[in-house]
A protein has these predicted regions:
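Long recognition/docking surfaces used for binding and targeting
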Residues: 193, 200-293
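A short beta-sheet element
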Residues: 710, 714-761
Length: 837
């Protein structure tokens, strides 16, 4: 097969999956870009696809036009001119724009009617020789029977953005016509399920539907007969419920009332071939619809990108499930927060695919194969979700993927009554999941539910992690997505010790910031890969290496668009073979990843048992160790007051400068990224009476939390975009710091305040801040205790105050030069308007 390299490449790639389903071998049956010497054009022509079946004489050709271009008689005539050329001589042609398919007789230019109807079909490979034989005998024939072919006509697959738009359109259809969207997700899911069943019926020989209705036929119904579509859909559901083993997923009645709603949704769904959409696109679009219609953000639901699912599968081992199945081992794979079933569908399909390969390689008898298929579909995969509609969708997904819905349950996984896992009877061999982030599940749990958990908490993730550990068999594995805060906050220390006590931590994988951004979720997260211990290690005496890995790209940007030339196969192969390969050295890196090892005895000595990648980074630790050896002081040693943050005044107490007495220094607006104190007419002030209250409180408690003096160093200590900003308060006016600012007061004879401020905002102090801060996206902070840990570089000549001042002056001089150049460049850009006059 020659390569495809034309302006119509995208169109050709859209129809190739359809041709493959029709039985054609893309490599052996097609020639691409075949030159044609006899043509109506003045220049040489090329046939986009010539169907030869590997023979000397071609059978028909396919002419592809640009996506979005309406097909015209001119397009038909061009294809037929190729068909009539001396090199080609085929009896019929196909013209397509990636959306429509039209077949024409090469002799009379008439549209060919297959089985008495004009449809977007191409004869299958098993039918084509008979079709060509008919046309050779009757060159002008246009009414051709292809054995009552009941296959679906061609429809295009859609990329993610267009699928999102299609699903959003469906949601709008329900909202506008029904005037009620409470059941939009459940109802749309049922119609989508019917369409997916229709495609499954088209693809699989051993799967049949108990009715003859088809979406593409119903879509042709005129609006005044829309009630026929409504009746057809209800009849389809009724027959599935009554006559199939999977009918329970459709038992909940449809709430849609208006026939026009049914017709509109059927038209939209009939326009797409979902089996030709990428798995990523289908899953992402479905999850997009979940969020848009369920208001399910309370449950922390969001889509786990396929690339991340693949990374997690590579970590635990791609062949683990199939090997267990073939060997006859007992295996239970659970996702306790399964959503619409993304993990389970992927794992089941991959396992079935690997089993098929083993059969083709003659490693299994047909009987072995059949037994394994049955086991994979019925005994291995379990899933739970707290939302009834989402759990039903997971069942639907599993049915479409291969009828593995038996153990998908609508339940609260954290309840003691959950059926898919029990703390008192651990039976999970592998848990792969992405549990809800940011939920406070503990508040909704009954007293007996809480008794399951040894580490008391209300955080949903913490509860999920504990129950995962407690419900996994010894030697079983857990691979879960987690909020970064689980790895580093002081509140999570008890949980991390519980993990270290009960599990061997195989890997902690730091994920790129854009991991969940395609679905409008901005969460910094990691993957935690654990193995359940046979016996708890209460004293944390077991010393082994934990792999810490950072991935810088999963192959797509924040919008979801794929990165050109990103080689996912190379990336996944290295994740599988190299990331946890300690033999490659304690520090190792590869294609879009970097990893290092840390011994657990070091982590056990850490006050908070931190497990975040940035905290243990070897480069950071090496420089920190150097400063400690040089006997450099910490902030705790330098600060003449207790390092602390106060409480912000109520915004009701803020006044303008004219009415105020003391400035309120805010981390976001009063401290610049270049180390300057910023006071504007919009700055907030408080009256003297309130300032005196703060002053009195400091004197009574014998500690200063937010009263600022001239020369104090002010460190912004919370929030994305503000944390780490630092300045020196250089005004002789009363001021207090808000609750997001840490005050550091030093002896100017020991260290220069400006040097320290610059060290914290752009020197190695900034690196320490990045390593020490805790929390996750949107909720990060540097606690006073973490500020105290920062070591200040006074090594060598930096101990000299004059040297410190000179370093700071040079830094600020360079920054002012930079800002001046930026301002100058902006003025140059503004002059563009003057060019227009």
């Amino acid at each position: 097969m020659s390569s495809i390299n034309t302006e119509t490449e995208t169109v050709i790639k859209k129809i190739l999956p359809y041709m493959k389903r029709r039985g054609y071998d893309i490599e052996k049956d097609f020639d691409f870009e075949t030159a044609v010497s006899t043509t109506d054009r003045y220049t040489k022509g090329y046939v986009d696809i010539l169907v030869t079946l590997g023979k000397t004489h071609p059978l028909f050709l396919i002419e592809a036009k640009r996506i979005g271009k309406n097909l015209t008689n001119k397009d038909r005539d061009q294809a037929i001119s190729y068909a009539r050329s001396k090199e080609i001589k085929v009896p019929f042609v196909v013209v397509t724009n990636g959306k429509d398919i039209q077949c024409f007789n090469s002799k009379n230019k008439q549209r060919i009617i297959w089985d008495g109807r004009r449809s977007d079909k191409i004869p299958s490979r098993s039918q084509i020789e008979r079709v060509v034989k008919i046309l050779r005998a009757k060159p002008e024939e246009i009414m051709i029977s292809i054995s009552n072919d009941e296959s679906l006509p061609f429809r295009q697959g859609l990329p993610l953005r267009q699928l999102n738009a299609l699903f959003a359109k469906g949601h709008n259809t329900i909202r506008k016509i029904e005037k009620d969207e409470d059941f939009a997700f459940a109802d749309f899911s049922k119609l989508l399920f019917l369409k997916l069943l229709e495609e499954k019926n088209d693809l699989e020989e051993n799967f049949t539907l108990p009715y003859s209705y088809r979406f593409y036929e119903l879509a042709e119904t005129p609006v005044h007969n829309a009630d026929q579509v409504k009746n057809a859909i209800k009849s389809m559901i009724e027959q599935i419920v009554q006559n199939t083993s999977y009918g329970d997923v459709l038992r909940e009645p449809l709430r849609l009332e208006n026939p026009r709603t049914y017709l509109g949704l059927v038209k939209d769904l009939a326009s797409v071939s979902f089996c030709d959409c990428s798995v990523d696109s289908k899953g992402a679009a479905f999850e997009y619809y979940v969020r848009a219609t369920l208001k399910g953000k309370k449950l922390g639901q969001y889509f786990t990108p396929r690339e991340l699912v693949q990374v997690m599968t590579c970590l635990v081992g791609e062949d683990k499930i199939i090997n267990s199945v073939v060997m006859g081992s007992t295996l239970k794979v659970l996702d306790p927060a399964c959503g619409t079933g993304g993990f389970l569908v992927y794992l089941m399909q991959e396992t079935l695919s690997k089993l098929e390969i083993k059969k083709k390689n003659r490693e299994l008898t047909q009987e072995n194969y059949d037994q394994c298929v049955k086991k994979i579909k019925e005994e291995i995969f379990y899933g739970s979700d707290a939302n009834k509609g989402v759990a039903a969708s997971a069942k639907m997904n599993m049915i479409i993927a291969g009828d593995g819905h038996t153990h998908i349950v609508h339940e609260d996984s954290l309840s003691i009554n959950a059926v898919n896992w029990k703390v008192e009877n651990p039976d999970c061999n592998l848990i792969m999941t992405n549990p809800p982030f940011g939920t406070a599940e503990g508040d909704s749990l009954a007293k007996n539910d809480k008794e399951q958990f040894q580490v008391s908490t209300t955080k949903g993730q913490y509860l999920f992690l504990q129950k995962m550990i407690d419900c996994t068999v010894a030697g079983g594995e857990i691979c879960t997505v987690i909020d970064e805060g689980v790895l580093n906050t002081s509140k999570g220390a008890s949980l991390r010790k519980y993990i270290l006590t009960n599990c061997i931590i195989r890997a902690v994988v730091n994920l790129p910031a854009e991991t969940f951004k395609p679905n409008k979720i901005n969460v910094k997260s990691s993957v935690l890969y654990l193995e359940k211990r046979k016996e708890p290690d209460f004293d944390l005496e077991d010393n082994y290496r934990i792999t810490f890995c950072a991935i810088d790209s999963l192959g797509y940007i924040g919008s979801g668009d794929k990165i050109r030339d990103y080689d996912k196969s190379v990336f996944l192969e290295e994740i599988k073979k190299n990331v946890m390969n300690h033999g490659l050295g304690e520090e190792r890196k590869g294609y879009h990843w970097r990893a290092y090892d840390v011994w657990t005895n070091v982590i056990a000595e850490d006050l908070y048992f931190r497990l975040d990648y940035k905290y243990w980074d070897p480069k950071f630790k090496k420089e920190l160790s150097r400063l400690v050896k040089e006997d450099c002081p910490s902030i705790k040693q330098l600060n003449m007051i207790v390092t602390a943050r106060g409480i912000s005044p109520s915004s009701d107490c803020y006044v303008d400068e004219n009415d105020g007495y003391a400035l309120v220094v805010k981390a976001g607006s009063n401290i610049s990224r270049f180390g300057e104190l910023v006071i504007t007419q919009d700055s907030d002030w408080i009256e003297k009476s309130l300032y005196d209250e703060y002053l009195q409180r400091c004197e009574e408690n014998n500690e200063n939390r937010n009263i600022i003096r001239k020369g104090d160093i002010l460190l912004a200590s919370t929030g994305d975009g503000t944390l780490g900003k630092c300045c020196v308060f250089d005004k002789s006016i009363p001021a207090i710091a808000d609750g997001h600012v840490t005050i550091i007061r030093v002896d100017k004879n020991v260290i220069d305040p400006y040097y320290l401020a610059d060290y914290l905002r752009c020197g190695f102090g900034s690196t320490q801040i990045s390593a020490y801060y805790s929390g996750s996206t949107g909720l990060i902070e540097l606690t006073p205790e973490q500020v105290d840990m920062i070591i200040v570089d006074t090594s060598g000549n930096k101990a000299d105050i004059d040297i410190q001042k000179n370093i700071s002056k040079n830094i600020r001089r360079t920054e002012k030069k930079y800002t001046a150049q930026i301002e100058k460049a902006e003025k140059v850009l503004e002059s563009v308007e003057e060019i227009w006059g």
